[in-house]
Amino acid sequence: MRRSDKGELLMAASVTVQLTDWLRGLSSKLMQAEVRLHNASVIDPDMAVIFAANHFTRIETLLLPCILQEHMGLTPGSLVPAALFRGRVGKYLKASGTVSADEVNEDTTVVRMLLRGGHPWIVFTDHPAHPNSKRGQDNVLGGLPPQADGLPHEEAAALAIRAAYCRGRFRAPQRRESQEEVTRTLRRFGLESTEEVDARRTVIIPLNITYYPIRLRDNLFMRAAEHLGRHANAQALSEISVQGSVLDETIEIDISFGEPLDIGAFLNRPEHTPVMACTFRAAAELESDPDGPFQRAARALAREIRDAIRAEVTVNLDHLFAGLVLEQPEGRLFKERDYRERLFLCYLQAQKKARRLHPDLKAQCLALLHDEELPAFRELLRIAVEKRYMLASEWGYRVSPERLRPLPGSLVIAAGTARDTVLREFEAAHVRSTLCRYAAWAPDFVVKAYLRRYLVRQDLREFEKDYACFYHPRDCKPPEVGQPFLLCPWRIRGGVVLAHGYMAAPMEVRALAEHLRRRGFAVYGVRLQGHGTAPEDLAQQQWENWYASVVRGYAIMRTLTDNIVIGGFSTGGCLALLAAARKKKSFSGVFSICAPLYVRNYSIRLVPSIISMNALLKRFGQSHYARDFVENDPENKHINYTRNPLTGVRQLTAIMHATAGALSDIEIPALVIQASQDPTVDPSSGPDIFAHLGTRQKQYSLFERDRHGIINGEGSPEIFAQVEQFLLRTARELSSRKYWLFGRRLGQTLSRLFVHRHRTGQGSEGGSAAEDLEIKTNNY
């Protein structure tokens, strides 16, 4: 054997080993991926099925058959473009039973199987605009007439129409064709007699596959593909770069089945009756006519397939962010907070208009609205800036003039656009214009007003629902006691999120809120979950639900002002301190009034044991001996519950421990107020809170009071004045800092402007820079 032959054999063996490892890794990734099937029950045994799927990368040719076989027990055939049947990948596809569109007779393979009621088929077709598509060599729309859409599912539509037409003609009780013509047509499809044609319906099932997340970057798959050498074309390399990103990490795959499109019923529509009226001989001639009834029906069916696939998309955060970037007006600056609010607005629109949402989308958009850190959002921002879809500056984000202009109607990525897959997918989903256009173009004050109204209404609806569910004349106070409230002055100096105490209601802090509103502060009185209704409602709550109520209050106040102080009375003070520790950059200050780290009633330590005993008694059917509530004698009987659930006491203990551990993380100005003779909260709680605060800007005020509820009744105006002074001081400091930051940024911009003019010596360029400075200043 010649040395060159040995070298070629060694190289071929090396490529084979590498490809085998790639395929083995691919299978491993597919097994690890989380796959969710939606609406799979539409598949019926009496159907002859063609699956028409959205097609972004060649990975679907391997992915879909594996998933359908593993999760549904189906063994579909696959008809794929000939461009993929090259090199070792082509050999693997042939070995797995996949059929090349150019190397097979579709009549004797696909249509024959459909007529006999065999296994279903997945038809993968090249988009006509692809450079590797034979149909795209003559016309960018695939050789179709100029009025055609150039849709990627025309081949699947044509096969389905051919199968439905032949089934209808073969099974018709009276045919106009001669027996010789029938026999010749049967032979065309590899059939012996009309008895082989069963009575199943020919249907196309739209199938949408959505990946989440897709983080596009260089990957091992792309490097492995380079070993394919001359067998890998540009389109394959472009798509493999996406495939590697798709399966380079834990991926979630949503596969949604649309409602079956009955091709027989489609052909019985008045506009398509000429198709079914044709004889076999006439049909063969009309099928080759691009303006004939067969081609018109195929194009109409392809459009229906396209729309059905788009309707089944599983909308996720990548979709919403991509659509928002695409719709962001040129020249308009968006801050990070703008993206957060507008993404939540997109989510609200998606709830109304999209058929299916990713299961994590609601939690992600709520986290964005609450200004919580979300790695997925941070990664999307980074990718958008890195790929130059957006230009980042200290003023905000501006859309790049070079941003992607999507191709209308494309369901498949074009060569060289692997990095744009997320945007292509969103464009193909046809949710961009309906979901994101309003959110991107609406003025800031409109977005904030809409979100504020929505969030306040949600809080009120939740209260009304809980109040109606747990209503009891003995325990429930009037609705106005438990309703959350929003108070706004004419001119807002700042905002306050105000939380009430344990077993109380928003009415408890209403007097303080009214005082602060008269001093120019907007106040949102939070209703902690389980409060303001009945003790049975409180007994079912966890302290995390109380914290979530406070965070929702922050989101509401954030639509009014950036200067937000959080505060609370008693347990509400603990929640305020905890929120200030966790959301360090969200608040300008925090205050607590009689917040408990310790309580005077030492019997609270017995509560866990009593709860365990209650559970044991209920387990053995002795629930009448269990004691779930204890009597409570509150100061404000018109507000507080008169029965205290023991499970609520356990949650109170948990929130006190959580607060004690978070005090050192508080880095914003803080005010701690304590009553010297508090009969409920141990007075040592105030000094201990003050001592463990992480901030240096802190104040401790001790008032000579022998009551716990010092924010109502005698002596409360002094408490109000103390809180007011703290808020005014915090507002002044924040205002001074804003002016200082603005001056520094303005100085930096002027410095760059003067340096630029000095270097260029051209007044015109200086004038252009000055105009740019004016635009930035106005946007700020």
What are these regions (language model features)?
Residues T57, Q677-V681:
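Acidic catalytic loop of the alpha/beta-hydrolase fold
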